[in-house]
Design a protein with these regions (language model features):
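Phosphate-end processing signature that detects enzymes handling 5′-triphosphorylated RNA
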Residues: 3-170
């Protein structure tokens, strides 16, 4: 496990420390993507101290708990477990209003893989890219399509996009 993954063992699951930076996308990245997957996700809880997310990613289901981020917004605790996809679909029915619908593209840049999310529905027109790092000061290549950094800006958190979608920002 990398430094960003191994932190605390809880039962048979690892509580990870997620270290990532987030950017707006300002240009065409699709020709560089090596994979695309449709994601639907909702939140059972979206309080600032922790979020509990349910996700359907292709034909797999997941439940994820994320803790509060550090002051910079770069790192926070995360625990994720794969669950049966039918269970995830059922849990989506009881999530808070504002289910997120997006396509995630994976784009290799240097030694890192960027996850580029293109949103639909109430968040249509918003595209963000995240890169996971092994520590907060790790250097990475920045592609030409990477725009303004929005790491730590809560309005770009998926849990906030369901409450205050992109269509309401204009």
């Amino acid at each position: 496990m990398s430094g960003s993954e191994c932190l605390t063992l809880i039962g048979e699951y690892v509580m990870a420390q997620e270290i990532e930076r987030k950017f707006l996308v300002d240009g065409d990245f699709r020709s560089e993507a090596f994979k695309a997957v449709r994601i639907t996700q909702g939140y059972l809880s979206s309080v600032p101290e922790r979020t509990v997310r349910v996700r359907v990613k292709d034909d797999k289901g997941y439940i994820t708990v994320k803790g509060v981020g550090d002051e910079s917004g770069v790192s926070r605790f995360e625990w994720e477990k794969e669950i049966p996809v039918d269970d995830a679909r059922e849990l989506l029915r009881i999530c808070e209003p504002g289910v997120i619908d997006k396509t995630r593209y994976l784009v290799k840049v240097g030694t890192h893989t960027f996850e580029v999310d293109e949103f639909y529905g109430d968040n249509e027109g918003l595209t963000v890219a995240e890169v996971e790092l092994s520590d907060e000061n790790e250097a990475f290549d920045k592609p030409s399509w990477l725009g303004e950094e929005v790491t730590g800006d809560a309005k770009y958190y998926n849990s906030m996009l369901m409450k205050n979608p992109y269509k309401n920002w204009k």
